[in-house]
Amino acid sequence: MEAEPPLYPMAGAAGPQGDEDLLGVPDGPEAPLDELVGAYPNYNEEEEERRYYRRKRLGVLKNVLAASAGGMLTYGVYLGLLQMQLILHYDETYREVKYGNMGLPDIDSKMLMGINVTPIAALLYTPVLIRFFGTKWMMFLAVGIYALFVSTNYWERYYTLVPSAVALGMAIVPLWASMGNYITRMAQKYHEYSHYKEQDGQGMKQRPPRGSHAPYLLVFQAIFYSFFHLSFACAQLPMIYFLNHYLYDLNHTLYNVQSCGTNSHGILSGFNKTVLRTLPRSGNLIVVESVLMAVAFLAMLLVLGLCGAAYRPTEEIDLRSVGWGNIFQLPFKHVRDYRLRHLVPFFIYSGFEVLFACTGIALGYGVCSVGLERLAYLLVAYSLGASAASLLGLLGLWLPRPVPLVAGAGVHLLLTFILFFWAPVPRVLQHSWILYVAAALWGVGSALNKTGLSTLLGILYEDKERQDFIFTIYHWWQAVAIFTVYLGSSLHMKAKLAVLLVTLVAAAVSYLRMEQKLRRGVAPRQPRIPRPQHKVRGYRYLEEDNSDESDAEGEHGDGAEEEAPPAGPRPGPEPAGLGRRPCPYEQAQGGDGPEEQ
């Protein structure tokens, strides 16, 4: 009886099965290795590389959109809740019925003090926190603190509102510094992924030309601020769809108001102490706060799940390894740079103008004359104007660099002159369209200011080792300006406008002076960034050269670098240096190397 052949031929077996399989490929020791482990026959390396970098670029766009949407939702929830909370707590009937003698006005004043005063200390800890947690995780942590502030409004007490307000004040500057750093890094990454062929030709250590990422930075900052300025409109949704139904009309709330605009003093002098016709039910308030809490949680998920890392893990290690003492000192050392000193007046004005939009135009000119029920629509006009005008920052792709920033300053200068001589009549609605136009135009100037400043800093300081320090300084000066506005809230409107006008003129002149120095080729004095001092031995540091070292490190190093070895192959295994262990290949070639103690 003849034996049946095996179902699967044995590899290398001789016999009647033959030396070839059904596909004609030789079996056994004669089988070609390329047929088994060779490249895919239809593999196109150039096409696969193009697809890979295309996915990388789409990932960068996803990061920018997620960070922008997260910032918009976070500030929309925060501003909307704070506005609704202050209006409810202002009404004395609401305070007496809901909270009795708990001292709600005192709690509100302490809460505002915590939000406005705490950021003054942010220069001391912001760079340390960003380097410790990393840019993305600092954003996530700060957004989480904003969500914590929202959650404390479920139980409004001194021991919930005031500590959460202090924590929120501590998170303001780190959030904005990390976001500015994040958007700038995304622009640099997008440029890297778009010009990968040029980088392959130049080598990984060759730095791209200075300012080459500027077009992408202009686009990304325009996208970010276009989203962010929509947060002012999102913040008015609780007011429009909920709180406006409970408000008195302007004839009641403005009954004792005698002067508005440039003739007003403080904030809403003579405004009625009762603004609510009926008190909102506690269940309705809980529903509104729950919706806001859900949106804040969504913002956290956006940052956590959709925002990728700003740096590679090895770069994060290098950024931390310069020493915590150096990280603490470097923001102060950057004051030596004349570019930053010339931009400080613009940083201060940037804080002044956004607070003036919310308190001066919206309250001193708007609510004072057309009533509290139109506050939301004034801020929506400001928001839409600013969001649309953020896209005007793209004009920097074709116009000289100073044009958008100076144009925004010019719009604000014109409006400030007009507001200085305008005093709207209380309880008269005929001039309400002027208020909406003024709010929208102020938003245009704000957008050009914010977009222009952030783009300018990203262009002037493109070294990854400096960006968190620079954006920390920028937003710290903004926080100082906001604190100054908080202290001077009781001043006469003419005094506020005069301070605004002087600061704006000084900022524009100082900025143009800086641009003139740059055109003359005056070299800025930048502090040296110390080289990373790694305390661990890991696979990342087996090689002597630092693959993540930037040109700034190489050019401005501390002079302790070793001479480069002569080019050309060296016979035998490379001897292990004093600072590293021999790799396994070297150990196999030349022994186990020096023994460790």
From Swiss-Prot:
Residues 1-29, 522-597 are annotated as: Disordered. It is a multi-pass membrane protein. Induction: Up-regulated by TLRs agonists. Keywords: Adaptive immunity, Antiviral defense, Cytoplasmic vesicle, Endoplasmic reticulum, Endosome, Glycoprotein, Immunity, Innate immunity, Lysosome, Membrane, Phosphoprotein, Transmembrane, Transmembrane helix. The modification Phosphoserine is found at residues 547, 550. The chain crosses the membrane at residues 64-84, 110-130, 132-152, 160-180, 223-243, 285-305, 343-363, 378-398, 403-423, 428-448, 469-489, 491-511. The keyword Cell membrane does not apply. GO terms for molecular function: Toll-like receptor binding. N-glycosylated. Glycans are attached at residues 251, 272, 449. This is Protein unc-93 homolog B1. Interacts with TLR3, TLR5, TLR7, and TLR9 (probably via transmembrane domain). It is linked to Encephalopathy, acute, infection-induced, 1, herpes-specific: A rare complication of human herpesvirus 1 (HHV-1) infection, occurring in only a small minority of HHV-1 infected individuals. It is characterized by hemorrhagic necrosis of parts of the temporal and frontal lobes. Onset is over several days and involves fever, headache, seizures, stupor, and often coma, frequently with a fatal outcome. Expressed in plasmocytoid dendritic cells (at protein level). Highly expressed in antigen-presenting cells. Expressed in heart, and at lower level in kidney. Expressed at low level in other tissues. GO terms for cellular component: early phagosome; endoplasmic reticulum; endoplasmic reticulum membrane; endosome; Golgi membrane; lysosome. It is found in: Endoplasmic reticulum membrane; Endosome; Lysosome; Cytoplasmic vesicle, Phagosome. Coiled coil: none annotated. InterPro entries: UNC93B1. Belongs to the unc-93 family. Plays an important role in innate and adaptive immunity by regulating nucleotide-sensing Toll-like receptor (TLR) signaling. Required for the transport of a subset of TLRs (including TLR3, TLR7 and TLR9) from the endoplasmic reticulum to endolysosomes where they can engage pathogen nucleotides and activate signaling cascades. May play a role in autoreactive B-cells removal. The keyword ATP-binding does not apply. It comes from Homo sapiens. Its main location: endoplasmic reticulum.
